[in-house]
């Protein structure tokens, strides 16, 4: 009987080791979503040229492993990569599928992660049509994804990053459904993390579409063991009244992933400069 029990334990361990999303060692990651605000000369003192060093210092200080970023123009992407040796970026710009317009890039530590596959699709009725504006959207929107492997543990997972439309309610709902379909199709049983500026708060249809879908995606902040910092992300460089500020940037995870803590820093950094018109959100995940 003891021999049979021992063999069952060994067999179970073997099966788990070869199933998607399982490996011998857990993977612990520091993951962020961060709308860095596009390089707009009208921002004057808050223009990118005055914030880029503050942003990159923040990323280094937080030791972020992977970041989904939004509103990143090509020159901003170059600035980030120049100032962040050891990081690489995945993604293309939304207007031409190359360098024109905003990226929704995935920034990651090159020495830790192997990119197995990656691509960008357009949030529209025609996801492979470059530059297409979907449904009732005001402008072109994209999602960038990557299937990655942690070189330290062998864990395979999917990262998805997006920026939803700021006008179209149908576009936001349909974008949510499209991304869920893509995660199911590409990730399968592997863990997946969705980051983005969703341009909606908790009580929106798009948020409910993501969190109540039969394919489960959980709001990382809500399931975190510990939550610190402020409760909002968008503040418009401090111009939104304190009682009107909302959380419109989110990180969602599949059920295999544990969230040890979630942190949204105060909008003004230690040197007195704003990081952006949005606060980033940082989570520590265990895959």
Question: What residue ranges belong to the model's regions?
Answer:
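Metal-dependent phosphoester-hydrolase catalytic domains
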Residues: 112, 170, 174, 181-192, ...
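N-terminal, active-site-proximal structural segment of metallo-dependent hydrolase catalytic domains
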Residues: 2, 6, 19-83, 96-101, ...
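Active-site beta-strand/loop signature of hydrolases that rely on acidic residues for catalysis
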Residues: 30-36, 55-80, 107, 146, ...
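Structured beta-strand-rich core segments of catalytic domains in phosphoester-bond hydrolases
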Residues: 66-157, 261-265
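Solvent-exposed loop/turn segments at secondary-structure junctions
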Residues: 36-39, 72-76, 94-98, 112-113, ...
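Metal-dependent phosphoester/phosphodiester hydrolase catalytic core
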Residues: 138-140, 149-173, 186
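Sec-dependent N-terminal signal peptides
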Residues: 4-14
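Second-shell loop/turn segments in exported
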Residues: 40-46, 64-66, 132-133, 161-169
């Amino acid at each position: 009987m003891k021999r049979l029990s021992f063999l069952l334990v060994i067999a179970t361990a073997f099966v788990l080791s070869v199933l998607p999303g399982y490996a011998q060692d857990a993977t612990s990651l520091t993951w962020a979503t961060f709308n860095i605000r596009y390089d707009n000369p009208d921002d004057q003192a808050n223009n990118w040229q005055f914030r880029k060093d503050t942003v990159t210092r923040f990323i280094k200080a937080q030791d972020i492993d992977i970041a989904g970023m939004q509103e990143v123009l090509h020159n901003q992407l170059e600035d980030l990569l120049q100032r962040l040796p050891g990081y690489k970026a995945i993604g293309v710009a939304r207007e031409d599928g190359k360098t024109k317009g905003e990226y929704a890039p995935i920034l990651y530590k090159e020495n830790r992660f192997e990119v197995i596959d990656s691509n960008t699709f357009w949030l529209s009725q025609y996801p492979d049509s470059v530059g297409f504006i979907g449904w009732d959207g005001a402008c072109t929107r994209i999602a960038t994804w990557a299937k990655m492997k942690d070189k330290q543990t062998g864990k395979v997972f999917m990262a998805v990053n997006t920026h939803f439309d700021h006008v179209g309610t149908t576009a936001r709902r349909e974008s949510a459904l499209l991304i869920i379909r893509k995660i199911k199709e590409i990730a399968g049983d592997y863990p997946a993390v969705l980051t983005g500026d969703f341009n909606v708060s908790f009580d929106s249809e798009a948020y409910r579409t993501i969190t109540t879908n039969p394919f489960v995606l959980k709001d990382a902040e809500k399931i975190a063991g510990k939550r610190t910092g402020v409760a909002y992300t968008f503040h418009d460089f401090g111009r939104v009244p304190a009682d009107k500020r909302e959380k419109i940037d989110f990180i969602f995870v599949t059920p295999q992933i544990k969230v040890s803590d979630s942190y949204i820093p105060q909008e003004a950094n230690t040197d007195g400069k704003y990081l952006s018109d949005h606060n980033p959100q940082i989570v520590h995940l265990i895959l």
